[in-house]
Structure formats: structure tokens, C-alpha cells
Amino acid sequence: KPAANSNPQSSIADRVAEKVASGQSFTANWLFDVANNAYGGTMADGTYSVKDAYDGMELGINKYLMNADFVKAGNGSLKDALNTLSDLQNILRNIPTQTKRTEEMESYQQFSTPPTIAFTAARLANITSDDVVLEPSAGIGGLALWGKAWGAKVYGNELSKRRLAFLNELGLDGTFNENAEQINNVLPDDIQPTVVIMNPPFSSTAGRMKTNKTANAKRHIEQALDRLQEGGRLVAILGRGMSDDAP
């Protein structure tokens, strides 16, 4: 049995980032072998969950993207943006899909934003180095990384302490462990975002009730808007239940 790494999240992420940077594809079995070594045990014996492995993979991809030249160029011309989108699609073709789910994922709708969609949302937000960016439900930082790559000051909030440990590896300007349904009420007064970029849970609420209503996503957005500076921009990725023609 291998000895557990003192920072398994970072260990998995570093191996994944190396693979992505080299343009090599890898399988879920390769990822789980890396996780076995990082955690000093296996999923079967309960040392870590499948979500720990997946989140380590996402962290590695996000770390790579944050410093990649093609990502930094993605905020330029339309041609640059299309090239960035193409490079992201190539990366997605080389990584395993997340076919296994956990109770935590289902209860709190922890479905990470694909890099192609995250880039599109960030591009729409028109982020510059003068901005202060807030991601209220940051997960592993798939949305937040774009602000950092483009020189902005970025803050991320994540309710799950387990996922927050991964997010903290990304080197944002600050992270918080709060319920995004109350983000304006609980964040320090000096956090004044000019941009909010978000992918709120489409229906699930945090806490003991764990109710599933579209109104919960609306509450996330209202709280984020209350915190947004006057003249700021908010870009939200939403489910069909929030569309104008939804019943």
C-alpha cells in the first residue's frame, strides 16, 4: 500500500496538468491509479471517493488553463476566441467523462461547468485586469480561473469544505466557505465585485431541507446582484426552468 501524499489534491492535479500540457489523452483507470498513489489507498477501501479523483482531475486542468498562453489570448479578438475554443475542445477529447456520481453531487448539484462553456461565459463578461470578479458557487474554479488568467482580482466561494480544499489550490485572491443563497448578507463588506460569473445550482438548496425548486437558483442570482457594484456585469449559466417561457 503506497504512503498517502501530504497534499493528495495537488498531487493528482500536478500529474493531470502534465498530461494535458503534453497533449496526451488518459483514461479513468489512469486517473484512479494516480489517486490511489496520492491518497495511499483505493476507492474500494474507502480511502477516497470517485468525486475526489474527478475533482483532482478538474483542478489539474484548471491549473494548466490558468497559465496557458492560448487561454490568456482568449480575451482578445474573435479569431483568438475561436482558437481558444478549439484548443479547449481538443483537451476535452483527451480526458475521461465523469460517468460516476456521488450522493454529494446529486444533493448539491455539484456539476462542474465544462471549460468550453466556462470560457464562453467569461468572454461574455468582458473581464479585464481592472475588474474584481466573484464566483459565488466556485466548485473547483472552472469559472474563476478565467478572471485570474486575464489579470483580474478573483474571489471564489464554495459551500463544500471538501471542494474548498481543491479550490484553495488554485491561488485565487480569496476564498470563502458560505452558502451562496446568502452571499451578499455574509461576505465581508470590502468584497465589491465589478463582475459576477456564476453557474448556480439549477434547483437545489443547501441546508437540511434540500428542497428542489427553481426559486433557489433565483435566490442565488438576486443575492449576487445585490453584491455587484453599480455598473457591473453578471453572467449566469442557467437551466431551462429559468427561461422566459418556462411554465
Predicted regions and their residues:
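Short glycine-rich, flexible loops that bind phosphorylated cofactors or substrates
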Residues: S204-A206, S243-D244
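Class I S-adenosyl-L-methionine
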Residues: N5-N168
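A short acidic, Gly/Pro-enriched loop at the edge of an enzyme's catalytic core
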Residues: V186-V196
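Amphipathic alpha-helical repeat scaffolds
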Residues: I197-P201, I237
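Surface-exposed cleft-lining segments at the edges of enzyme active sites
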Residues: A206-N212
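Conserved SAM-binding strand-loop segment of SAM-dependent methyltransferases
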Residues: L172-E181
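Conserved Class I SAM-dependent methyltransferase catalytic core
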Residues: A121, N212-P247
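A general structural motif
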Residues: S129-D130, G151, I191-P193, G231
